[in-house]
């Protein structure tokens, strides 16, 4: 059956402290999968994700968020795609914290992937950096553990650049027309056709809290990201019926939208610099 990369409140966990193995087992059992899925060939090198996590823990990286895809085929549940967000010890406090996003599965739907990200505490937004900051992919063969550890340090090496770009965005002011343009571009990423967007750019750039009322590029982006990921905005469908935007609850959709929004923000940064 087709993998449905979705997770809900029973398939994800987030804490303000490192997650324990018991918590990971309860919410993301595929991290502990005892073997590869039967569809994988003999060339597939199987290593439980928890082994990778423990090696990363030894290097000072701790998981604070984890989620697992819901699947229609229950036979794939223990092998399904999972995502963890890890932080380096000593880099936990502050308004934003850099993270390593680790994705994997044991059913063939994903290699090991590591992507740089940022977690924003005020709105609990988990951001994903665009491809221009590097994305590490490790296939299921050879010295997986060594390659993943090396990849983690490669991702760690781009955090300074990520932070520099973030601080630059905080210094860039956007007027109302420019914010509208940002919101419009974001809606096109999600819905592709302006005639099918259930909400307006004004709605997607509206802040949900007073801390996000600033008009800089960074904050505008945060407002858009939160409104798109969390959903719940009132609007009208293409047929004119009242509707509400849906939250983005799939791993693949979350990564895709986040990367696209980062690209839009980077384009605005270059345009306004």
From Swiss-Prot:
Entry keyword Repeat: no
Substitution effect: residue 14 to R: In plasmid IncFII R1
UniProt KW keywords: Plasmid
Pfam families with a match to the protein in the record: DUF932
Family: Belongs to the UPF0380 family.
Listed name of the protein: UPF0380 protein YubP
